[in-house]
Amino acid sequence: MSVKEYLSQAYRLDQRINSKLEQIKSLRDLAAKATFALSDVCVSGSKNKQQMENVIVKMIDLENEIDDDIDKLIDLKREIVSMIKQIKNPEYQTLLELRYLCFRTWEQIAVEMNYGIDNIFKLHQKALRSINISQTVQ
């Protein structure tokens, strides 16, 4: 795994968490519809109740997955912070933190650091080369 791939893991994990949060929202909307259907029907609604139970079980499973993913993300960010702290150059540290911990775009980083975008790309390559991933990642 390259340094860039390793550092990018946090962003990918954050995306998966956000995707699961959207899925939960969708399931909540579905559960609300099922609840509405239950209150509308005065006859035996065992099918609707079962549908509602299935939605709730799926929501709980997703929430547990999100909790696990958040724990992983926190641990991964700690590892990335530790890796970045080993770099002597503060500009490299700032750039890597903005990109891989704050998930800023290249344009945002260029503005925040008062550099042109081409200089940010060059600085990024130098920053990546300054990291020895073999010492940090097993």
Please provide the spans of the model-predicted regions.
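N-terminal positioning helix adjacent to the helix-turn-helix/winged-helix DNA-binding module
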Residues: 76-79, 90-92, 123
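Short alpha-helical "recognition helix" segments of helix-turn-helix
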Residues: 108-111
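Short amphipathic alpha helix immediately N-terminal
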Residues: 88-102
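N-terminal interaction/assembly modules
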Residues: 1-86, 133-138
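DNA major-groove recognition helices of helix-turn-helix
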Residues: 120-131
